Amino acid sequence: MTQFLPPNLLALFAPRDPVPYLPPLDKLPHEKHHNQPYCGIAPYIREFEDPRDAPPPTRAETREERMERKRREKIERRQQDVENELKIWDPHNDQNAQGDAFKTLFVARVNYDTTESKLRREFEVYGPIKRIHMVYNKRSGKPRGYAFIEYEHERDMHSAYKHADGKKIDGRRVLVDVERGRTVKGWRPRRLGGGLGGTRRGGADVNIRHSGRDDTSRYDERDRDRERERDRRERSRERDKERERRRSRSRERRRRSRSREKEERKRSRERSRDKDKDKDKDKDKEKDKDKDRDRKRRSRSRERKRERDRDREKKEDRVEGEVPESVDVPQDDAQTGDLGIDGIELKQEPEEKNRDRDRERDREKDRDKDRDRDRDRRRSHRDRERDKDRERDRDRRRDRDRDRDRDRDHKRERDRGDRGEKREERVPDNGMVMEQAEETSQDMYLDQESMQSGDGYLSTENGYMMEPPME
């Protein structure tokens, strides 16, 4: 194609000059020759260190040992810090500790959102307050969760000490105690290894048992409340377990009934399928019998037809073989009747007739066979189509029955579930009514016990029976 281009375009397709060959600057790896062959290390063995002069191996510290060492060092460091702080700690010369120590009340476990005005409102009910000192973190300025309240009278401090312990302020129950740093000899705060822990009573067993409360009657009431709450929880737990057992039993019964119904449906379907199969077999047998009967009938008709044909042939042969004696046949006519043209005998005509008759009979037999074969083919095709239609109808009926059974099962399960839920809703309602009645009776009993008597009064702050304040 390019040969027909003009010369100016052919010049564009001309090949370039070949790249000039330049010898490589470096030799290939297999062409390089090493000046010195490889040598052994025998001359350098004397430079090695003698194994006998090597230092003994050092034992490294394991992870567990390192953690234990760090924990021990931390404890020792903390003990050293406590000892150093104990040397310089003097509560009597503390600049932040002001006022009379015997009129000062210590309040702990205070909510971080509680303000000084809220504390003043809560503790002014016991007496006039002189000063409130809330402790804050020196670095971040956030509250530490405790405060010191100084009353104007010592009896007001004692009243607050007795009645305000366990009082709920801003969602938290506070712990109330006297100031022990300047009133108890040898007292040390908890950060220096002292303190009362989480309570103001003393021993570990008492602290854990009473959780920082001082009044024995209040402990007893609180224990009774705990026991009552525990019993209520146990009863509710037992009711839940019984309800769950009833539900499980009902579910098991429903499951068993569903399984039985499924088995019954399966057996009924199998029985109906067997009946259909038996009916099909009976129909097939009847059909085979009809076919055999038709075949036998056709064979008998063919036999009768053959017999009639034979009888007819015999009669014709008998009629042709008889010649009347009264008729005189001339000799010339007899000779001409016996001999045909060119001397052929005329007695061969019955043989040809017999041969034609046999040929015609064979043709009729073949026609009958073809007709019977076509009839059987049409009948078998019709039977196959009928069987297919019957099988299709049977599958359609089976699918319809299966869908109907499934819908019935879903409806029955839904009805049972609704009845079970209604029954369970009725049962807990009665149980809750009884439980509420029991709680109401218990609360009335407690209210009767906590009524004001001649020796004490009912505190509106925490609801405990207290002794009247000392004059």
Swiss-Prot record:
GO terms for cellular component: nuclear speck; nucleus; spliceosomal complex; U1 snRNP. The keyword Ribonucleoprotein applies. Residues 246-259, 294-303 have a biased composition (Basic residues). It is found in: Nucleus speckle; Nucleus, Nucleoplasm. Residues 103-184 form the RRM domain. One of its GO terms (biological process) is regulation of RNA splicing. Component of the spliceosomal U1 snRNP, which is essential for recognition of the pre-mRNA 5' splice-site and the subsequent assembly of the spliceosome. snrnp70 binds to the loop I region of U1-snRNA. This is U1 small nuclear ribonucleoprotein 70 kDa.
